[in-house]
Amino acid sequence: MGDYNMNEFAYGNLYDDDDGDVGGSSKEGNNSIQKVSMLPLVFLIFYEVSGGPFGAEGSVNAAGPLLALLGFVIFPFIWCIPEALITAEMSTMFPINGGFVVWVSSALGTFWGFQVGWMKWLCGVIDNALYPVLFLDYLKSAVPALATGLPRVASILILTLLLTYLNYRGLTIVGWTAVFMGVFSMLPFAVMSLVSIPQLEPSRWLVMDLGNVNWNLYLNTLLWNLNYWDSVSTLAGEVANPKKTLPKALCYGVIFVALSNFLPLLSGTGAIPLDRELWTDGYLAEVAKAIGGGWLQLWVQAAAATSNMGMFLAEMSSDSFQLLGMAELGILPEIFAQRSRYGTPLLGILFSASGVLLLSGLSFQEIIAAENLLYCGGMILEFIAFVRLRKKHPAASRPYKIPVGTVGSILICVPPIVLICLVIVLSTIKVALVSFVMVVIGFLMKPCLNHMDGKKWVKFSVCSDLAEFQKENLDCEESLLR
């Protein structure tokens, strides 16, 4: 679009210096913006993916203790590890903002790059619409006025604006805020796991009733608590030494996320008598009370509220930098590439915040189901792009590479694709129709943007750093972006 011909964009060595910074990750005047280091990045990944066991209660409600625990053991191998490995390889191959949009555009063209960007951005905004609502749900028992009416609406608005302002102030601030929030949110579950040991009855973990399993709720709960590993790729250009930092951070993130979901469920289902109907969102606070008393319940409630804020911050960062990356690549209008004096994508933040406010009235379960379906559609495009780039450009530089060949790269994608098919088959008609409409809107938006570009109604251009990189590498044998 505009000045940007992706057929001419040549891939070479994207690292400009020893720190692995990318030309195009920062515009002139923002080069002094501090990059995100390892520890904040791990906690950003943690909050982009899960944020802890809050919401995992539905797995026990849907399938009982045994299948819930097995799900959080097996699911990481089927979904988390393959997605994290692919994200690590692709993010070091293309360490620039935009992440998966760049991968798909490279392999399948900008039309499909825009579609994956649209679906994933919409998923992020839908996801973020949940967090202010859930935050208030955890507090309404202490402050009943927050349950309904004007006080609730005003609280959602104020909370959204405050968290949006934190995103505006810079990714480093968001990262370190995520660290402190993550430590505070997970400490009560570490305490609960220790306190529960004398009360554990292992036989409670083995309860299973295959004839009474809500598979749709079960799979959607697992997927919602363990997906979004690719989100960190959208801000790869903001990471210090991404070719080393990103793979390690993703590895630590997988371990952290898996344990943060499994251990609380292990202690909760093993320490108290089972009543599946009670295992709904927020029930872990009651479990904490039964195990440790009222003080632990209050701590878990405070941790849940804090975790929702952390997930909001991390998700908005990912969504806004995705829009910035798409603009720097010439897929969105140039105005989306503008940064604030703190190096943050101003318009991307405003668009994401507006979407959150518009969607905050939807029901929890419908949001999860619709979001998961859209997310699965985007993941299929990412898996296809990963395999295609492996096949068509095997010699391209990959600072981190999964140690498998073309056949191995296909096999890595098989388990998550099977899971995606299950989610699609089990989805309700209502959710499928809503998701289909959203996809159709994306299909219509791209030609409209092309028309606007042709009429010069809005300006599209590649970031100056990327344009310079393009010019210097036109003769490179490995031309990827098309």
Curated annotation (Swiss-Prot):
Record carries keyword Transmembrane helix: yes
Keywords attached to this entry: Cell membrane, Membrane, Symport, Transmembrane, Transmembrane helix, Transport
Any Pfam family the entry gives: AA_permease_2
Disulfide bonds: none
TM segment ranges: 36-56, 66-86, 94-114, 143-163, 171-191, 254-274, 294-314, 344-364, 367-387, 406-426, 429-449
Location of this chain's protein in the cell: Cell membrane
Molecular function as annotated in GO: polyamine transmembrane transporter activity; symporter activity
A Gene Ontology biological process term: polyamine transport
A GO-annotated cellular component: plasma membrane
UniProt key word Cell membrane: yes
Membrane-topology descriptor: Multi-pass membrane protein
PANTHER family: POLYAMINE TRANSPORTER, POLYAMINE TRANSPORTER PUT1
Function: Probable cell membrane polyamine/proton symporter involved in the polyamine uptake in cells.
Family: Belongs to the amino acid-polyamine-organocation (APC) superfamily. Polyamine:cation symporter (PHS) (TC 2.A.3.12) family.
Name of the protein in question: Probable polyamine transporter At1g31820
Organism name: Arabidopsis thaliana
